[in-house]
Amino acid sequence: VLILAAGNGGGPRGGRLDDDRLRQLRLAAQRLTPETAAADVSAAARAVVGVQAQDVRAAGLALRSRVPGLCRADVDGSRLIRTWTVRGTVHLIDPADRPWLHAVLGPRNLARFDTAMRQRGDYDVAVTMLGDLVAVLGDCPLDRAGLLRELAARGHPGLGQRSVNVLMPWAAAQGLVAGLPDGRYRAAEPPPAVDAELALATLARRYLAGYGPAAAADLA
């Protein structure tokens, strides 16, 4: 199998590996071996460009498998951000990765969620309540139930849980909202601009470092 891996200088290098060696290298790259375990949750999240976090508890287990001795409080008390990244799905990421991930994925995720909002007939309502959403989350972090209550108190009583499921990623794709590891949300400043080509190159390099060796098609 022709593969690519991150070279010492950060660029890809090619080669051929048998299946057993390929599995060993991928486990090591994902910090799933004792020798390559991460020192803390931030290092673990950086190593794999974020862990899936649709389920908050499952995300904690994914981090625990990479950080020896990790407990739930370590995750909840960390600086990790819960947001929508690849494929429009929720991941826990290190804050330092937010600017370049947003540069690569923000526009496409915004288009995805724009479409979903329009299909549900929620787009115009969402635009009118966006300012209140950011203001409410700027006061203090809230879970979805708390957010619904606060928005209802500000004159948006018709917003349901299903609408929030689209509203939150839509706001996050604009850089205005970020999630906490415990499942709550807070207001956020849009991340600093990053050159799109540089951000894309960073994604390729980091993907190979965290999931390689990989075939060129895996980066498509």
Regions from the language model: what does each represent?
Residues L2-P157:
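Phosphate-backbone binding and catalysis cores of DNA-processing enzymes
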Residues G158-A220:
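Loop-centered beta-sheet repeat module
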